[in-house]
Amino acid sequence: LQDIINEFGGAMPQTFGVPVEEIVRGIKMGVRKVNIDTDCRMRMTGQFRRIAEQNKAEFDPRKFLKPAMDAMRDLCKARLEAFGTAGHASKIKVIPMDDMAKRYASGSLAPKTN
């Protein structure tokens, strides 16, 4: 992801995230919270830069946004499949906003330590 940004004019210093394989291993060992926002932002940024470089006369932001969103969607899909979470949306129980507001107001969602 970083290489694409830099290939098309970016100047990101070398960074290292957690490889997908290690995240998958962590999930198998009980990790339940995984963040992929940085990867999503980097994927979109790389696509914006690629399009700007390859189409220097383009100024319509819609021409940048659609392929960038498609690239981010593809990255999310690949991550969700790798993490074993694809296809589970129907198992999520919707909680109405009013119910969540009551939970927050009652303090039942406040962090607790033992």
Curated annotation (Swiss-Prot):
Subunit structure: Homodimer.
Cited function: Catalyzes the aldol condensation of dihydroxyacetone phosphate (DHAP or glycerone-phosphate) with glyceraldehyde 3-phosphate (G3P) to form fructose 1,6-bisphosphate (FBP) in gluconeogenesis and the reverse reaction in glycolysis.
Misc. comment: This protein is encoded within the form II ribulose-bisphosphate carboxylase operon.
Classification via SUPFAM superfamilies: Aldolase
Name of the protein this chain belongs to: Fructose-bisphosphate aldolase 2
Keywords associated with the record: Calvin cycle, Glycolysis, Lyase, Zinc
Sample GO molecular function, one term: zinc ion binding
Xref: Pfam families: F_bP_aldolase
Enzyme class: lyase
PANTHER family: D-TAGATOSE-1,6-BISPHOSPHATE ALDOLASE, D-TAGATOSE-1,6-BISPHOSPHATE ALDOLASE SUBUNIT GATY-RELATED
InterPro entries assigned to the protein according to its UniProt record, in alphabetical order: Aldolase_TIM, Class_II_FBP_aldolase, FBA_II
Catalytic activity from the UniProt record: beta-D-fructose 1,6-bisphosphate = D-glyceraldehyde 3-phosphate + dihydroxyacetone phosphate
Cofactor: Zn(2+)
Binding site for dihydroxyacetone phosphate: 35-38
Family the entry assigns: Belongs to the class II fructose-bisphosphate aldolase family.
